[in-house]
Design a protein with these regions (language model features):
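Glycine/Thr-rich phosphate-binding loops of Rossmann-like dinucleotide-binding domains
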Residues: 99, 143, 202, 271, ...
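Core AdoMet radical
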Residues: 104-120, 125-220, 232-233, 260-262
Length: 380
């Protein structure tokens, strides 16, 4: 397990916080974006958290020195989920080495690894009597394995402490390191998630530490390593993307054989983050769910204004496993092969990157498929 290479603490629980940079991006030039303090649509209004179960879980997390992405990322569903006794654990500290322009998690210099964290997480999962748990983390780019060893240890500890509890992980790209990915997968999570976050054009501006094709290839590599593993990703809408770009992202994700997709509305955490380009309506989300499942063959699409990566995660997993409409069984029968499955010798993870957010010409050949949707100006 990688244990060295961290930074001295200070400013946050596990590191030194730094500014994320400018909140303006090129994609918003000429757009009439949503004011920070503008009135939100009715469908985005949620009840403030504070029920008895919420307070119990908050006390439990504090007493065990654990972090949740529900709190750190300012998730709007925290009241609903915590009252239902579910939470998404965030490991590897609470300071991220990357400065994504949409994310509320603190950016800066993380501290040393907490080697006792996996045991505390497993003990808390047992105390909560969970049947399905989601584990995510900050990026730890200063670590040789990106934190993969701690992920694997956490998964293994949960399996031992709570036999029968399924473990879903939402991992960073681990800098595209397939050996680190294998470390996580060898611990046998039930679902492996990695979020694409946005369309290719917006990546350089809003996700400067990530790469569109690195994320696509990372998800495809997981399927190449273990085709039976369910894979999952999420895209945030309302940051300036266009309909054709969403369809293209869906197409690219299905080429990587991704099973589950989540789609949710971007909510601006602060003035230091990029503005909301527009509010996506519930009807639009419902249509994207239909498009994703019926046209592109995703095993399940969870789409809605308040949907986040781990929202209704247990229900998503059970629905796909049970073979409900849009299920993985149907997907596997007529699946679109990932590039790694059809191109001999294709190294899906280690892509050659050109300028930020763009793939060098010739660095990868695209796999053929027959599920591309028509452009917006073409008849459906």
């Amino acid at each position: 397990m990688e244990t060295s290479g961290g930074y001295a603490p200070g400013g946050k629980d596990t590191g030194l916080v730094k500014p994320k940079g400018s909140s303006s991006i090129r994609a918003h030039e000429g757009l009439d974006t949503v004011p920070m303090r503008g009135r939100k649509p009715e469908w985005l209004k949620v009840r403030s958290p504070g029920g008895s179960e919420y307070l119990r879980l908050k006390g439990l997390m504090r007493s065990r020195a654990l972090h949740t992405v529900c709190e750190e990322a300012g998730c709007p569903n925290i009241g609903e989920c915590w009252e239902a006794g579910t939470a998404t654990f965030m490991i590897l500290g609470d300071v991220c080495t990357r400065a994504c322009k949409y994310c509320a998690v603190a950016h800066g210099l993380p501290t040393e690894l907490d080697l006792e964290e996996p045991a505390r997480v497993a003990d808390t999962v047992r105390a909560m009597a969970l049947e399905h748990v989601v584990i995510t983390s900050v990026n730890r780019d200063e670590l040789a394995d990106g934190g993969a060893g701690i992920y694997a240890e956490t998964i293994s500890r949960i399996h031992k402490a709570v036999p029968g509890c399924s473990v879903e992980v939402l991992i960073p790209d681990l800098k595209g390191d397939e050996s680190a990915l294998r470390v996580v997968m060898e611990a046998r999570p039930a679902i492996l998630g990695h979020n694409l976050e946005t369309v290719e054009r917006l990546h350089p501006d809003v996700r400067p530490g990530g790469r569109y094709w690195r994320s696509i290839s990372f998800l495809g590599a997981a399927k190449r390593i273990d085709a039976s593993l369910l894979t999952k990703t999420g895209i945030i809408l309302g940051m300036g993307e266009e309909a054709g770009e969403i369809r293209q992202a869906m197409s690219d994700l299905r080429e990587a054989a991704v099973d589950i997709l989540t789609l949710g509305q971007y909510l601006r955490p602060s003035m230091q983050h990029i503005p909301v380009a527009r509010w996506v309506t519930p009807a639009e989300f419902a249509e994207w769910k239909r498009v994703g499942e019926e046209h592109f063959g995703f095993g399940h699409v969870e789409a809605g204004p308040l949907v986040r990566s781990s929202y209704h995660a247990k229900e998503q997993a059970r629905a796909v496993e049970a073979g409900e409409p849009g299920s993985i069984q149907r997907v596997l029968e007529g699946d679109i092969p990932a590039p790694a499955e059809v191109l001999p010798g294709f190294d899906l993870v280690q892509l050659e990157i050109g300028r930020p957010g763009r793939l060098n010409p010739g660095a990868v050949r695209r796999a053929p498929h027959n599920l591309r949707l028509p452009r917006p100006d073409e008849p459906g």
